[in-house]
Design a protein with these regions (language model features):
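Conserved helicase/translocase motor-coupling segment
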Residues: 545-564
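Conserved proline-anchored active-site loop of SAM-dependent methyltransferases
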Residues: 110-128, 206, 414-428, 543
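SAM-dependent methyltransferase catalytic-core segment centered on the flexible catalytic loop
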Residues: 111-189, 197, 238, 255-288, ...
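Cysteine-dependent PTP/DSP-like catalytic domain, specifically the C-terminal lobe
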Residues: 153-163, 168, 217-222, 226-229, ...
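DnaQ-like (DEDDh/DEDDy) 3′-5′ exonuclease domain used for proofreading
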Residues: 1-116, 121-175, 333, 455, ...
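Phosphate/ATP-binding catalytic cores across multiple sugar-kinase/actin-like superfamilies
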Residues: 97-100, 104-107, 172-177, 183-184, ...
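Signature of N6-adenine DNA methyltransferases within the class I
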Residues: 173, 186-187, 196-257
């Protein structure tokens, strides 16, 4: 029975609770909510009031996030072997992004620093309809979700008839965002573009998934054109990008100062250029009663006491408490200037702000960037004047998002699992720092009834490539990389990428078998994943599954003519014909090579006889009694 059969919508959450609160589970596996409340009672305030987001299919969406993918990862060996791609850390995945996210979680959980997505807006004209390939019956769904047969039938109807309702859009987005949350690093952030049609719903599901306290704001971007005025309303000239952090207390990174900003820093001392602002707090919460610990006397250059009195005459407060003020004085950050207050010339304190290392907090209103029309023209130029996309986000928009992402450093990963026109990949290549990207895009067949898609399909056919959306996205990356190199021959950024496709095996394998019948001679199909896709597919899928990622430097090791694959704590044996000489060679490698210590031996079960596997186990069992004291774990996979 496959593991997916026993999964429930809350399987991930239950696993987390079992790991951290084992005492709250009874012997039969049931969860004791009262014991859990008692455990938390002295640590948190338990609220009995609140609200939650509900929509048709929410539990179904959570179930989809829990079900493991059955796809395999097929490397594009011809593309990946090209010099510009062979050592690239960038990854492009062709496949359903739900499957792609599930594969990524096995290697990149909590490792992605920045996620940007531009999902379907569900406007009615963007082609969004909900469909999925899961083959649940109403009875199965009713049992898994603990709902009525009628509710189960309504959910299945949504999944099969190509609905574009709000519930369908929410059901589509919810599992993808659940998985995306688990990919984010603790100091990472996700940026999600949307327009007016679903922005309210997006805010609700993001609050539900990421936590309302982790919302870092909403970017309002001018698109450069106004739409929707025909309806009699105001129309729209903006779209939005919600920003959520993985955890609270993250700070958006600052932007470089503009020429206008730099004009403020027109003073200079031995520490460098600086601007200054008065020490007294201004604006809201500036009264003594608002900050009583920040109301105190300080000495001016003449030795007189100075209090934070507002020009209106009321007692105000300083910007900092006394201890911090004393440190500012010690560091020479306090500047005294003569000024006129209430008709009298007096000393007044200011705080210096030095230019070095200073940036500015970005505004949520972004009107200075070029709009979508120019972005579309730029992509058209890349394709020699051919318009292959109707709607494209500007590269500068994504670059600015990367720029303000918290705590970004070289080598960090940027993910876009609605890659589309591949603007995110283009932006990453143009950034000054060396980041890596992962793109995921469904290989949707381009629609010849849409002019730009028909043109794109013809373009791809002329260069001998399939007419799918992922292919035109990859071609955009290739052409952008060429242009970047032409403009800067000294660039050392990673401008290549490795390509992988997600494919569903056609045969029934042992790990997928739901029911065994010894009388069913047609139970097994003649081909295996190895026969259908080859060694590199099996190996790549396993490497990602075991946490090594898509670009792991695996080593092919020769064992008396038999090739095994070694990385980290794993030795993979996939091919057939594991003879005695090879088994002896594997054992001797363990015994004589001090750097060869894989604790896990993974075997492709179809390739070996019972005798071969037992012989290998017997030979390697003696390693636990030798100097290395290794106890080998055998993992037989199908």
């Amino acid at each position: 029975m496959t593991a997916n059969e026993s999964l429930a919508p809350n399987s991930q959450e239950i696993a987390i609770l079992k790991e951290h609160f084992p005492a709250c589970f009874n012997s039969d596996g049931s969860f004791d909510i009262e014991r859990f409340k008692d455990y938390l009672n002295d640590k948190v305030n338990i609220a009995n009031e609140g609200y939650e987001l509900r929509f048709l299919g929410k539990n179904y969406a959570r179930l989809l996030a829990s079900v493991d993918t059955t796809t395999v990862i097929v490397p594009d060996e011809e593309h990946n072997s090209k010099p510009e791609n062979a050592n690239s850390e960038n990854v492009y995945i062709s496949g359903d992004n739900l499957d792609g996210l599930k594969h990524l979680l096995k290697s990149y959980a909590k490792k992605v620093k920045c996620i940007y997505i531009d999902p379907p807006y569900n406007t009615g004209s963007d082609g969004f309809v909900y469909n999925d390939s899961y083959k649940f019956t109403a009875e199965e769904l009713s049992d898994k979700l603990s709902i009525s047969d009628e509710q189960a039938a309504r959910i299945l109807d949504l999944t099969k008839r190509g609905s574009a309702s709000h519930s369908a859009w929410l059901m589509f987005m919810y599992p993808r965002l659940l998985l995306a949350r688990d990919l984010l690093a603790d100091d990472g952030a996700i940026f999600i573009s949307i327009d007016d049609n679903e922005q309210a719903n997006l805010k609700l599901i993001c609050d539900d998934i990421f936590g309302e306290e982790n919302c870092m704001g909403c970017i309002c971007r001018s698109t450069g054109q106004t739409t929707g005025q025909d309806s009699g309303g105001l129309g729209s000239s903006f779209d939005y990008a919600f920003v959520y952090g993985r955890k609270p207390d993250l700070d958006i990174a600052g932007l470089p100062l503009t020429d206008h900003d730099l004009k403020r820093f027109d003073n200079e001392d031995s520490f460098g250029k600086y601007a200054y602002d008065q020490l007294r707090k201004t604006g809201s919460n500036d009264r003594r009663e608002d900050r009583p610990n920040m109301y105190y006397a300080i000495k001016d250059p003449d030795g007189n006491d100075v209090y934070p009195t507002a020009t209106a005459g009321y007692d105000s407060c300083w910007r900092v408490e006394r201890k911090t003020y004393d440190q500012l004085v010690a560091d020479d950050y306090i500047l005294w200037k003569k000024t006129t207050r209430n008709g009298e010339e007096v000393w007044w304190p200011y705080v210096k702000y030095y230019l070095e290392g200073r940036s500015k907090r970005p505004s949520p209103l972004w009107t200075e960037l070029d709009g979508n029309k120019k972005a579309t023209r730029e992509v058209r130029e890349l394709f020699g004047g051919v318009k292959v996309f109707d709607y494209v986000k500007p590269v500068e928009f994504i670059k600015k998002i990367i720029q303000i992402s918290p705590n970004m450093k070289e080598g960090d990963i940027i993910l876009d699992f609605f890659s589309g026109s591949a603007t995110t990949a283009h932006a990453v290549m143009e950034t000054e720092k060396k980041y890596h990207y992962i793109m995921v895009q469904l290989p949707a067949i381009l629609d010849e009834t849409v002019t730009s898609q028909k043109v794109a399909k013809e373009f791809l056919e002329n260069i001998g490539r399939p007419g799918t959306l992922d292919q035109i996205g990859m071609e955009r990356i290739i052409r952008a990389a060429i242009k970047i190199r032409e403009n800067n021959t000294e660039i050392t950024n990673d401008l290549g990428f490795r390509h992988y496709s997600l494919s569903e095996p056609s045969g029934i394998t042992l790990d997928k078998l739901e029911h065994f019948s010894p009388n069913d001679n047609g139970m097994f199909v003649s081909n295996t994943v190895l026969e259908e896709f080859g060694i590199t597919t099996v190996l790549t899928t396993w490497l990602v599954r075991d946490g090594y990622g898509f670009t792991a430097p695996v080593e092919a090791v020769d064992f008396a003519g038999y090739t095994g694959y070694y990385i980290g704590k794993h030795l993979y044996l996939i091919k057939q014909d594991l003879n005695n000489e090879a088994i002896v060679a594997i054992t001797e490698k363990y015994e004589t090579d001090g750097t060869f210590n894989p604790e896990n031996v993974v075997l492709f079960g179809y390739s070996f006889t019972w005798t071969e596997m037992e012989s290998l186990k017997t030979n390697l069992a003696r390693l636990k009694d030798m100097e290395k004291n290794l106890r080998i774990n055998f993992d037989i996979r199908y």
